[in-house]
Regions:
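Active-site anion-handling motifs in enzyme catalytic cores
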Residues: 2-394
Length: 394
């Protein structure tokens, strides 16, 4: 499944090349998820020799984007095929990121269940959780997670949800791995194509589609809300606005255009149409003066670049990140146009104070995110020790 590598170190731990599988929402559909995977891979490779297999929705995209040793088409694998693939691993990682919620938990936990069946250790890596209302799903999540080797969540709300459904094993609160992503600079030509030029004040917006992870979104409400906000910043701040799609396959583009269609000043708005990597979007946000948005990793990227932002939380994972950087805001369904415009106006007036606050807290969040890899490495070292004792080190 994966190519073996040779290492000259004399220690068993360093000779051991761990076959690690990573299962999550991968395959180029969401730039936030790809940022998580990129950061995870970089940390693992910097820490221990590993051969990586990613369970993905798009094998070609994952191999090209991340350069891993192997990728498997998770949606096409039968249960027996998936079991055989998992059985070849030394460690299975679920995550990073992702949400355990009623509609998606069965599929999300399949490889974890198979790993337990074949005796492969499992780390659940920086997930979020909720809503979990279905009793069958609650039981599945509880029984599955109580039998993993390491369990980390990226926000306190996720820990509360898992504790509420009866998960008894230790749950470590860390942070989203994407906060460790490095920017990938853009050329001047690509910046101009994105509507960014020297001397222009740019405000970035993020729009997402409704769906199981965002059950409270009222499309008409939030389209009008963001259209009013975009018109407001154009007039109030003498700015241009860009809409940054984080999920192209799931209609971020269409919803961005729907917001623009409701704007009075639509001629001052640009919807990004080019393909960007996660690192390029991170770099692009560094050229903006303010950000307003819904998607978690859009807000994380803004914070990493020290760009003040006004968040519109639609789910616990977004609220959890906002809480981690010491900011508070009402949930999207409770926000009126007046409330949002007042929040933007106030945030803009205090943007330097807000920028300082974000840049002074993001380092602590990054430290929390590094705990994920530290725990993964501890688990890998334990596995290596067990392999050495049984003479199974390759």
């Amino acid at each position: 499944m994966a190519h073996k590598r040779s290492h000259k170190s004399p220690s068993n731990r360093q000779r051991f090349v761990a076959r690690v599988g990573i299962s999550g929402s991968y395959g180029g559909m969401n730039l936030g998820d790809e940022a998580i995977l990129q950061a995870m891979i970089a940390q693992l490779r910097a820490s221990r020799p590993v051969e990586l297999t990613v369970f993905t929705a798009d094998v070609g995209d994952t191999l090209k984007r991340h350069g891993v040793e192997a990728a498997l088409p998770v949606r096409d694998l039968t249960r027996d095929e998936a079991r055989q693939a998992v059985a070849q691993l030394d460690l299975l990682i679920l995550g990073g990121g992702g949400i355990l919620y009623d509609a998606g938990a069965d599929a999300y936990l399949r490889e974890v269940t198979l790993a337990r069946e074949v005796g492969v250790p499992v780390m659940v890596y920086a997930i979020s959780a909720g809503p979990l209302e279905d009793e069958r799903i609650r039981k599945l999540v509880r029984e599955t997670l109580d039998n993993v080797d390491v369990l980390t969540v990226r926000d306190r709300q996720g820990k509360r949800v898992l504790e509420d459904i009866g998960v008894e094993r230790d749950i470590v609160v860390t942070a989203d791995p994407a906060v460790l992503l490095e920017p990938q600079p853009l050329t001047e030509d690509r910046l101009r194509q994105a509507g960014i030029a020297e001397g222009k004040r740019i405000i970035a917006f993020s729009v997402r589609e409704p769906g199981p992870a965002a059950p409270d979104i009222d499309v008409e409400h939030y389209h009008l809300l963001l259209a009013h906000a975009a018109d407001f910043v154009i007039d109030r701040l003498e700015a241009d606005v860009i809409f940054v799609p984080m999920e192209r396959e799931h209609r971020d583009l269409q919803h961005s255009h729907a917001v623009v269609a409701k704007m009075r000043r639509a001629q001052r708005a640009t919807v990004l149409k080019e393909e960007y990597t996660s690192g390029e979007v991170l770099a692009l946000l560094g050229h903006c003066e303010f950000a307003i948005g819904m998607r978690l990793h859009f807000l994380i990227f803004a914070a990493l670049q020290g760009v003040p932002f006004a968040p519109l939380p639609y789910a616990s994972k977004v609220a959890g990140f906002i809480e981690s950087v010491g900011m508070g805001t009402p949930v999207l369904k409770d926000v009126s146009a007046g409330t949002l415009l007042a929040m933007i106006d106030r945030s803009w007036d205090y943007r330097e104070k807000l920028r300082h606050h974000i840049t002074s807290t993001i380092g602590e969040v990054q430290g929390q995110a590094r705990k994920n890899n530290e725990l993964a490495v501890q688990l890998l070292d334990r596995i290596a020790g067990e392999k050495a004792r049984t003479g199974a080190v390759r």
